[in-house]
Amino acid sequence: MRFDFHTHTVFSDGELIPAELVRRARVLKHRAIAITDHADFSNYKELIEKTTIAKEELKKYWDDIIVIVGVELTHIPPKSIPKMAKKAKDLGAEIVVVHGETVVEPVEEKTNYYASISEDVDILAHPGFIDKETAENLKENDIFVEITSRRGHNITNGYVANIAREFGLKTLINTDTHAPEDLIDDEFAKKVGLGAGLTNKELENTLLHYPKELLKRI
């Protein structure tokens, strides 16, 4: 059983339309997949509307997978994150992901911090290096942190795993899928987690228990 809460479609910079993304996820035995296209002030309404249409149509025919309507707030001014996350939720987004301070992109400093203080943010994606204050906020607001299979972003997976362990943060293994070959099955997800240094118990929580906990919010 596989869960992926961070993927992209042609609605932003991905290669697949929603139907093909979901079909390929079904082949890889996914139980749930979130469509979280890149969003800012200009397009979040359109993304939520389109993704909701896709979800409603697909669930008429495929009842073996849960499609989740989401957005990834990407490279927006850090101070705007809490307000934008609330707007997205109010408009119908089921989860809000924030594009964290990955070391391979010029994400503005304090993005992680402002994501961590928002009650409407669900996942901090590829966060890079997380400081103590941010980690404490993530814990307090019950925000999940991402361990990623995506090349480049995954450079700091080990650091993220250690911070999560130290502060009791909940981790998810996501793909940040943009192309068909980015999706992974459960066995490969296990390798990503073990490679990040997760223990067997932490891996079980990350692959099964924490995803189910997140699904209960939706």
From Swiss-Prot:
It comes from the Archaea. Transmembrane segments: none annotated. SUPFAM superfamilies: PHP domain-like (SSF89550). InterPro entries: PHP_dom (IPR004013), PHP_phosphatase (IPR050243), Pol/His_phosphatase_N (IPR003141), Pol/histidinol_Pase-like (IPR016195). It holds the Pfam family PHP. GO terms for molecular function: 5'-3' DNA exonuclease activity; 5'-3' RNA exonuclease activity. This is Uncharacterized protein MJ1295.
